[in-house]
Amino acid sequence: MSIFNEARLETWNELKGLSDEKLNQKPSAEEWSIREVLDHLKKIDMTAQKMLKERVKDAPIKEIEEKPLEVAQDRNNKRKAPSHLEPAHDFISGSQMKRELDVVREQLTAAIASLKEEDFERVLPHPVFQELTVRQWIDFIGHHEKRHLSQMKEIKEKIERA
């Protein structure tokens, strides 16, 4: 199974049974709630889907080095999300959030499925790695989600102790 799909399955397994209150509870004023992390992941999927639909056809096919995408999982390397990827701060139920994430992921998966084989070697800009092939971009989404899965586990521990 690809890291892209594996990470999402792990996310849903980790969050099973959490109440809406716990999903929306912030460990502190400066930290995101689990729901906010999920909203950020939704925005990543939306941005990736838009990029694949609008920019892949014009992107160059070229060989670039494999990037160490797993470093995206390292939470010691803190990064602030760009403003367009920051979460909304409203209360949303877990079932609504899951529906929204599932719909966006289905749209992203459909965009990926519509690509031709050579499109996976096209190169697109990336804010951290400068440029990635479409194949690397898709893997990056999985590694990025695993980073936030660790964050959600930390948040869960903090709010269960509170």
From Swiss-Prot:
UniProt-annotated stretches for the region Disordered: 65-93
Compositionally biased intervals (Basic and acidic residues): 65-76
Transmembrane segments: none
InterPro entries per record: DinB-like, DinB/YfiT-like
Pfam families for this protein: DinB_2
Record-linked Gene3D superfamilies: dinb family like domain
Protein name as it appears in the record: Uncharacterized protein YuaE
Organism: Bacillus subtilis (strain 168)
